[in-house]
A protein has these predicted regions:
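Glycan-processing catalytic domains of CAZymes
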Residues: 31-408
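Bacterial N-terminal signal peptides that target proteins for export
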Residues: 2-15
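Helix-centric, low-specificity signal for extended rod-like, repetitive segments
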Residues: 3-4, 22, 344
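Bacterial N-terminal signal peptides
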Residues: 13-24
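Sec/Tat signal peptide C-region and signal peptidase I cleavage site
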Residues: 26-30
């Protein structure tokens, strides 16, 4: 009896140890409060609790630059933190050096890694390929000392073969990121919506699928330089335009209408109408972004389980993209002229499509026709999070709005 009990106990102990090791080795994308944790990041720094609170109230659940003395506020408002330490991350215009970073990282990780808010450690923004070797050394150290935490590196925009198969592939090979994060700002004062956004995300999606690494897109929420003040439609098209390509997280640059207080970042002069203004007050953009974040949260439990199979445009076809093909699930649309359509397969094997109204000025009815006959077409409501029969032909899409359909 005692011998049998000991063997059983040993088996249980070994099982528990195995589970703990497996959980500890999960990549950053798997970590969150629950299974529907869809990262919505404020790509900004925080200096006070009030800002963290306003971010959380807007639906933000990750912050890109969190000093250690603000982790308590992230815990309080249930926001994940990418920990920032100036001894690890160089100023914005300086190359990354693993030597000082790797001297500081062990001390930093020992001090804060057990804090439940910690989701990763900030290494570098927009590095060129020459910095990947140094970044890889520090990323490896983070993985060793803080398994499951994100060695945070964000890539610059780009497009073309060099960016897709050279730059991103080199990044993945050298730094082994759990997530490919990049930024692209499509809304200019003299541009309706930059074609480069679609070419860039096509290449990122391609690299993401090829390397089996999910991607996040950082979009524009604060006007500066020659970028315009984002409207509700601008926000929707940037966010849904990323998700339709398969993005598994969204970042917002910036949240506060003022310069970063870190990285030695310069004052760009005309930051305006971000979610928080230069005095920390909530703006119309804050209200619009909160509304959009609520929609994404209601869709997140499904979005996180979808694998991107294809994406195509109706109307204007951007560079590096394609239109409807003979293999597309959607054969056409009986109303509207400008759409993006993403095809997905759910973990349970079901087929889904997302249709985005690419028109920034006009609403349109969403009346897709399908290549095959489906007995049940349902939609996941962004306002309720519930699935219901799709009310074709009455369902309309606001400018930049999307609908997620389940086909059976």
């Amino acid at each position: 009896m005692i011998r049998n009990f000991n063997r059983s106990g040993l088996r249980i102990l070994l099982f528990c140890v195995t589970v703990i090791l497996l959980v500890g080795s999960l990549p950053a994308r798997s970590q969150g409060a629950n299974s529907d944790f869809f990262p919505l990041m404020a790509w900004d720094d925080v200096e006070d609790e009030a800002t963290v609170q306003k971010m959380a109230e807007c639906g933000i659940n990750v912050i890109a630059f969190v000093p250690t003395n603000m982790l308590y506020a992230c815990d309080k408002y249930h926001v994940k933190a990418i920990v920032f330490d100036p001894l690890v991350t160089p100023n914005w215009d300086k190359p990354f050096d693993s030597k000082p970073a790797n001297e500081e990282l062990p001390k930093l990780i020992k001090a804060v890694n057990n804090d439940p808010a910690v989701w990763g450690y900030h290494l570098k923004d927009e590095p060129d390929g020459n910095q990947f070797v140094e970044l890889g050394k520090s990323a490896e150290l983070v993985r060793k000392l803080a398994p499951g935490k994100w060695p945070y590196i964000n890539l610059p925009p780009g497009m073309g073969g060099w960016y897709d198969t050279n730059y991103i592939d080199l990044f993945v090979k050298t730094c082994s990121p759990p997530i490919i994060s990049y930024d692209n700002y499509a809304i200019g004062e003299n541009v309706d919506f930059s074609y480069g956004f679609w070419a860039n995300i096509w290449d990122v999606r391609d690299a993401s699928l090829r390397n089996k690494v999910p991607f996040h897109t950082i979009v524009l929420t604060t006007a500066h330089f020659n970028y315009r003040i984002p409207t509700a439609a601008d926000l929707r098209l940037q966010v849904y335009g990323s998700i339709v390509y398969g993005a598994k997280g969204i970042g917002y640059y910036k949240f506060c209408s003022k310069p970063l207080s870190v990285l030695g970042a310069p004052d760009l002069g005309n930051f305006r109408m971000g979610p928080l203004d230069e005095f920390g007050e909530k703006t119309e953009t804050w209200e619009n972004l909160r509304n959009l974040n609520r929609q994404i949260k209601n869709l997140s439990s499904v979005l996180l389980k979808l694998h991107s199979d294809d994406v195509y445009h109706v109307g204007d076809i951007p560079e590096r993209n394609h239109g409807i093909t003979t293999n597309s699930l959607v054969k056409g649309l009986e109303a509207g002229t400008q759409f993006i359509i993403g095809e997905f397969t759910h973990e349970d094997g079901s087929r889904w499509v997302m249709i985005v109204n690419k028109d920034l000025k006009n609403s349109t009815f969403c009346r897709p026709t399908f290549r095959e006959t489906y007995h049940h077409v349902q939609y996941l409501s962004p306002s309720t999070g519930k699935i219901a029969p799709f009310p074709n032909p009455w369902y309309a899409l606001a400018p930049g709005q999307a609908v997620l359909l389940k086909l059976e």
